[in-house]
């Protein structure tokens, strides 16, 4: 909750490789639905490496529908085909299907050797938030573990769900189903504070290691609709990104 008592959601991405770093968030207004969405896209023309992983690293991460907001880390937000077969998604399928059922259609990400979990947040007009995850059972067991948990929303702290055992990308230890005796284990408490979506966005961005943070987005529910801030990106242009990369590897 914001300091004024309004629900908020935020989403942040990080990355270690140049391909993961060379991304940006963009806010779009959907003329067909009359609602906003946040897209994760390439900063400039996608590289060959990015093209190979496009379905994993480029996606709509935040969408709203009839007062409910869906936040996920992949195509499970609103895509209805996975590996050439039908798959349910949160934007059009949640309600008719549970979060676990939707993530079960997708499983964890096929990005060996990490096999990053797929995660999701669903927040409606009530005081509860739903978190869900699909993770590889273990390094030696390729079955998919799915779980979901409902968490009361309060004004004392922000709760989030992480794909990694630690908050920061540098630790690179994705959750495995065998680790999750209770789904609370992959929930994290964030020191996020603010009144408006811009303050929430900035607070979320600052919560991540500055070496790895890529972009952050946030929205606040004002009692009628979800109000989005323009996303905060580490790089505002391809030229800035390339200059930053050059500083890492001086000639």
How would you name each of these model-derived features?
Residues 1-251:
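Conserved short alpha-helical segments that host acidic/polar catalytic motifs at enzyme active sites
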């Amino acid at each position: 909750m914001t300091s004024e008592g309004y629900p908020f959601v935020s989403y942040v991405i990080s990355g270690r490789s140049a391909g993961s770093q060379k991304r940006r968030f963009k806010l779009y207004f959907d003329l067909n639905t009359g609602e906003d969405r946040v897209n994760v896209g390439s900063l400039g023309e996608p590289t060959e490496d990015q093209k190979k992983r496009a379905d994993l690293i480029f996606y709509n991460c935040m969408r709203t529908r009839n007062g409910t907001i869906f936040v996920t880390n992949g195509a499970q937000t609103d895509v209805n085909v996975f590996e050439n077969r039908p798959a349910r998604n949160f934007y059009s399928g949640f309600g008719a299907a549970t979060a676990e059922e939707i993530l079960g259609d997708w499983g964890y990400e096929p990005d060996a050797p990490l096999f990053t979990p797929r995660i999701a947040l669903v927040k409606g007009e009530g005081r509860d938030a739903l978190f869900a995850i699909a993770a590889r059972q273990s390094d030696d067991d390729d079955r998919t573990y799915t779980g979901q948990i409902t968490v009361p929303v309060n004004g004392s702290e922000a709760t989030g769900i992480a794909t990694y055992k630690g908050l920061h990308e540098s630790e690179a230890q994705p959750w495995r189903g065998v680790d999750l005796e209770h789904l609370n284990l992959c929930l994290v408490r964030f020191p996020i504070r603010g009144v408006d979506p811009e303050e929430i966005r900035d607070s979320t961005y600052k919560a991540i290691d500055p070496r790895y943070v890529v972009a952050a987005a946030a929205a606040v529910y004002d009692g009628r609709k979800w109000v989005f801030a323009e996303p905060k990106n580490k790089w505002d242009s391809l030229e800035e990104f390339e200059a930053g990369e050059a500083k890492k590897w001086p000639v």
